[in-house]
Structure formats: structure tokens, C-alpha cells
Amino acid sequence: MLHKGDKYRDVDGTEFQVFGALDDTYTYFFIANLKQNIVIRMQPKNATEFLSGMEKVN
């Protein structure tokens, strides 16, 4: 389960942070790409699959 504040690192060093999660009022996960300063909105299943291959930083 993803939680607000979780950070993940991709193989190329790009870090992503979850800043909106299901335990908030959101129906989507909001994931920030910290390298490019963009926000990605994903459905829960897609967000979990997207981050599953990455290393958890915190």
C-alpha cells in the first residue's frame, strides 16, 4: 500500500514522491517526479504497478 510521503528511486536516479493517497480525500494517487518537477495523477492500481519496480528511499 502506498502512503503519503513515500519516496521511490528509479534505476536512472529519478525520485518520485507520493503526496496524495487513498487515505486522504483523493480517489487518485498524485505522484511527483522530483527531477522534472511534474505531477502525475494515477489510479491506485496503475500507481502501484508504476512504483513496484523502484527502490523505496524512505
Regions found by a protein language model. Name each.
Residues 8-10:
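Tryptophan-anchored aromatic micro-motifs
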Residues 13-44:
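Basic/aromatic-rich interaction segments and small domains that mediate binding to polyanionic partners
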Residues 36-58:
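Intrinsically disordered, low-complexity, charged/polar segments
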